[in-house]
Amino acid sequence: MKRFLALVALVATLVGCAKPVEPAQKFDKFNSVVYEMNIRQATEEGTFAAAEKYLPELKAMGVDIVWLMPVSPIGVDGRKGTLGSYYSIIDYKAINPEFGTMDDFKHFLATAHDLGLKVILDWVANHTSRDANWWKEGKTDWYVMDEKTGLPIVEYDWTDIAKLNYKNQDMRAAMLDALKFWIELGVDGYRCDVAMNVPADFWKGAWEEVRKINPEVYLLAEGEEPWLHECGFEATYAWELHHIFNAMAKGGSETKNVAGDGTIKTDAKTVKDLKEYMARDDEKYPAPAMRLMFTSNHDENSWAGTEFERMGDAHKAFAALTFVMPKSQPLIYTGQEIALNRRLQFFEKDSVKELVDLEYGKEYRDFYRALCSFRHANKALAAGENVAPAQFVEGVADSVLAFTRTKEDNTVLCLFNFSVEPVKVTLNEAEAGDYMCACGEAKSFKPGDVVELPAWGFMLLSK
């Protein structure tokens, strides 16, 4: 019986081996990789001009879409910290002077487009700052008011924002006008903050109008509600999946049942839970829906912790999985490509100074470059109308997630060990064949061959 040893993590086998795939002439949103850029923290200067210099590195990494966190001026009333929250906006049509000028933004956008990158803006349609221009202009009926205080209501603990009133048609018209403004400027789409808190009929009508300007506009919703896809969004957040990742990595924590019946409750998750999630997700989100999958983003990094805190030694395996699951649209957050193990401050300046040193964090830069390359090289991994389903490998250990995905003449074989112990995977006739590993090495398997996966190890192959 022939045996194959998979190295501890994909990066151990593919660093320096995989070559970036040349981008197609036409943008393929269904096989794209998103990079969330935190302009404030991405460089020491925290400006568009400084961040623009990093765009060629993102292109070389294999990024397709650059999502910019909000770029508009930030409110002062109720401001959190020194610099405030990006999501507390004064003027939807203006640029935060902290980042530069409108001309600086246009230059950033032009450079991105010259490189073949798409740029989407983080759009906050649910609320403005408490001192926004609309409020100062006396448009109080544009807001949801608190009868007791006579001021706009506060949602959650967001004491620096004012909830907008979507029953007001004038406010809706102004919001649509602002959305169209940036598309006419050349922006390629939006990531919409707390999209599920904005009425469905507004989104549907707005996107119909926006697509008259640019039919190829790309739309990502922060929310998991399936109805968001019916309103025109291509992609939604896979939050539930992310929390399953965290729980699988930590192994869960046990607590006694509060009813006192002696049973134990646990938040631990296993591969079984992951497979059940995949089945639910497939049913809830019919193709061509895409699901944004991630191990970090601005919320998780600042408030829940880095992927190293939450996932420990499992972080690379889960990152790799986001690139190969059905309907996935993988996300990389600022600093992940250099293994940044620090919670970035949200309301203060906290630069990722090492990012511009292209020799720094080379192991992780190459790791993500190889994942992007593998994604782009295999049409079986693309989302879209004819998304290839996962066919699970039979007879594997409970800790193993093993599946193939096939589209036309292209098949990928993905093997993951989600445990702290090494495991052996015996391949069946269905998985036999000649493959190319994501590391660039050729591998041939016969029925009965065994692949050895170390703790949290994985292997990605294609033919």
What name fits each language-model region?
Residues 15-16:
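C-terminal motif of bacterial Sec signal peptides marking the signal peptidase cleavage site
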Residues 286-309:
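Active-site clefts of carbohydrate-active enzymes
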Residues 446-463:
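C-terminal beta-strand-rich structural cap/linker in extracellular carbohydrate-active enzymes
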Residues 422-441:
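Beta-strand-rich binding/interaction modules
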Residues 391-428:
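Carbohydrate-binding surface patches
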Residues 67-81, 122-131, 193-199, 222-226, ...:
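Short, solvent-exposed turn/loop segments enriched in Gly/Ser/Thr/Pro and often Arg
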Residues 20-64, 70-185, 205-214, 218, ...:
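Substrate-binding/active-site clefts of carbohydrate-active enzymes
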Residues 193-287, 291, 321-324, 339-374, ...:
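Active-site-proximal helices and loops of the catalytic beta/alpha 8
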